[in-house]
From Swiss-Prot:
GO cellular component: extracellular space
Function: Cytokine produced by activated CD4-positive helper T-cells and to a lesser extend activated CD8-positive T-cells and natural killer (NK) cells that plays pivotal roles in the immune response and tolerance. Binds to a receptor complex composed of either the high-affinity trimeric IL-2R (IL2RA/CD25, IL2RB/CD122 and IL2RG/CD132) or the low-affinity dimeric IL-2R (IL2RB and IL2RG). Interaction with the receptor leads to oligomerization and conformation changes in the IL-2R subunits resulting in downstream signaling starting with phosphorylation of JAK1 and JAK3.
Disulfide bonds: C79-C127
Gene coding for it: IL2
Database matches in InterPro entries: 4_helix_cytokine-like_core, IL-2, IL-2_CS
Taxonomic placement: Eukaryota, Metazoa, Chordata, Craniata, Vertebrata
Keyword annotations: Adaptive immunity, Cytokine, Disulfide bond, Glycoprotein, Growth factor, Immunity, Secreted, Signal
Source species: Bubalus carabanensis (Swamp type water buffalo)
Localization in the cell: Secreted
Protein name (record): Interleukin-2
Sugar attachment sites: T23
Length: 155
């Protein structure tokens, strides 16, 4: 009598696991990754906002796109990934004591790695960008706010 219910429960569990339904351990890993991404973005923002770099006006003239809608899901990280290459190129235009090319590359590689891990196998999402653009500081602030929002919903 209970065989059918048990088999249904097992089948449903397997289907959820196969489709990547979050488990408590994956949620814990996701929280750690989001926290790491948040810290990396904050560190990058500190370097960009450094008064020494503010004198390098070229870096602060470039525009970046942000998603048209408020980014609220991990799939929106694809939009960050698409703009990250431009940010790296812009930061390399203005080398200074606290923005050396090696550190920039390491930081960007780490951010890319984390974003790719958080995205998982999500490939069907297409970013829609706002018509208005933002400068580097505001761009980083928006993604920091995104990470804080995601992190707070997971706790």
């Amino acid at each position: 009598m209970y065989k059918i219910q048990l088999l249904s429960c097992i089948a449903l569990t397997l289907a959820l696991v196969a489709n990547g339904a979050p488990t408590s351990s994956s949620t814990g890993n996701t929280m750690k990754e989001v926290k790491s991404l948040l810290l990396d973005l904050q560190l990058l923002l500190e370097k960009v906002k450094n008064p020494e770099n503010l004198k390098l006006s070229r870096m602060h003239t470039f525009n970046f796109y942000v998603p048209k809608v408020n980014a609220t899901e991990l799939k929106h990280l694809k939009c960050l990934l698409e703009e990250l290459k431009l940010l790296e190129e812009v930061l390399n235009l203005a080398p200074s004591k606290n923005l050396n090319p090696r550190e920039i590359k390491d930081s960007m590689d780490n951010i890319k790695r984390i974003v790719l891990e958080l995205q998982g196998s999500e490939t069907g999402f297409t970013c829609e960008y706002d018509d208005a653009t933002v400068k580097a500081v505001e761009f980083l602030n928006k993604w920091i706010t995104f990470c804080q929002s995601i992190y707070s919903t997971m706790t």
